[in-house]
């Protein structure tokens, strides 16, 4: 798989997440893909649970901005160090950093994404 294809898919993942576009985001995954977001919580089926996942995002965040700080592509995968800035429904701002590891399927879509970050710390920043 070409590094360009992987980079394009990673960019699509982050841009659709930032836009809170569940349909576009789900298209980045194979039918049976799983996500660990964050790692340590039970896995979720990306396509099957996309609407529920984005429903939770839209309940918590007024605005979501993501930057791909560093992207490392190797073989059929990528690791991305990212920064997320949010405006909570509370009106408070929050910032989180993390690393997401993307595993590609031969079909050119993600088969697994594992994200390492502290979601509880971000939610504490925007709590009423």
Language model regions located:
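Short, low-complexity N-terminal intrinsically disordered segments enriched in polar/charged residues
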Residues: 1-27, 31, 126-128
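A solvent-exposed, acidic/Ser-Thr-rich amphipathic alpha-helical stretch
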Residues: 5, 23-75
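Short, cysteine-centered beta-strand-loop-beta hairpins and adjacent loop/turn segments enriched
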Residues: 59, 85-95
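Short, surface-exposed coil-to-beta transition loops
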Residues: 65-66, 81, 94-100
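A short hydrophobic beta-strand element
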Residues: 75-84
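A short, polar/proline- and glycine-enriched secondary-structure boundary/capping micro-motif
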Residues: 90-93, 121-127
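Short beta-strand edge/turn micro-motifs at domain boundaries
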Residues: 97, 101-124
């Amino acid at each position: 798989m070409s590094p360009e294809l992987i980079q394009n898919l990673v960019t699509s993942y982050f841009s659709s997440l930032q836009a809170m576009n569940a349909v576009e985001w789900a298209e980045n995954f194979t039918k049976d893909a799983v996500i660990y977001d964050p790692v340590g919580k039970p896995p979720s089926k990306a396509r099957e649970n996309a609407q529920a996942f984005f429903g939770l995002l839209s309940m918590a965040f007024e605005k979501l901005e993501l930057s791909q700080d560093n992207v490392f592509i190797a073989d059929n995968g990528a690791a991305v160090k990212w920064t997320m800035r949010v405006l909570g429904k509370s009106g408070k701002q929050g910032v989180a950093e993390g690393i997401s590891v993307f595993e590609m399927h031969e079909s050119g879509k993600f088969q697994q994404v594992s994200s390492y970050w502290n979601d509880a710390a971000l939610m504490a920043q925007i709590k009423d």
